[in-house]
Amino acid sequence: MKKFILSLSFLFIISTISHAQQLTDATFQHAVNACLSTNPVDGLCTNSQYGIMPDWDVSQVTDMTSAFSRDESFNADISNWDVSNVRSMERMFFRAFDFNQPLNSWNTSNVVTMESMFGVRYFSSNVPIDYYREMSFNQNIGNWDVSNVFTMKDMLSGLKAFNQDISDWDVSNVTNMSWMFGKSFNQDISDWNVSNVTNMLGVFYDAISFNQDISNWDTSNVLSMKLMFWRANSFNQPLTDWDTSNVTDMSGMFYEAISFNEDISGWETSNVTDMGGMFEGAISF
């Protein structure tokens, strides 16, 4: 009987501890701030009521918006987090310049927004204000399930070295792909289903390394291609078959895209209202 009572007491204690360590939307950001106030780099805040950050139970958290935004030195290993219920990762690592930990095991199947997830820029009237410092993250995230994501605006633009294979991403629900890629990205994304994308504003803005075949992209719903290949210095791929019938803005599209010299004479541009500076500085065209 005594052993039975002791066993019940032990189970109660364990249950209480486990419950205390489980974070919710109401407690998550407070826990992050408290932990990083004492251990801003590795999150090994042993005095936290939730334990050290790598071991946190975040399985009930749905909103991780701006979780580590502007935590410039943050670089904790959070690879084992259960993020299966998270819906927003918007600005999650915004200007977390030093973060470079593996996240490939994350279950992102319920995420709907990854806007500025690894971004560094502020925007003024939808024009980026570039920042002198870029982010370190360059990990494999190719097996992420992004099938429910609708916005990837500015998602990877702040990454100075990111050049990972994300060819298998299902982007069929994405509508906003503006300002998406960074300087080093040059991977095959030819099979992406972009048929629902309406905004390609600056998608390869300053993506100086990118030179992949995207001729088969379904661009029939795109409204803006403004600044799309702005200073994409390496890009020179055929775009002849693109459906541009709904595009209204092509201003600055190939601005200083110094390598581009492809035939786009067959494009339907009857709905375009702005072509200002479309080929300015495109010296090969």
Each model region followed by its residue ranges:
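Negatively charged
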Residues: 17-285
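Sec-dependent N-terminal signal peptides
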Residues: 4-15
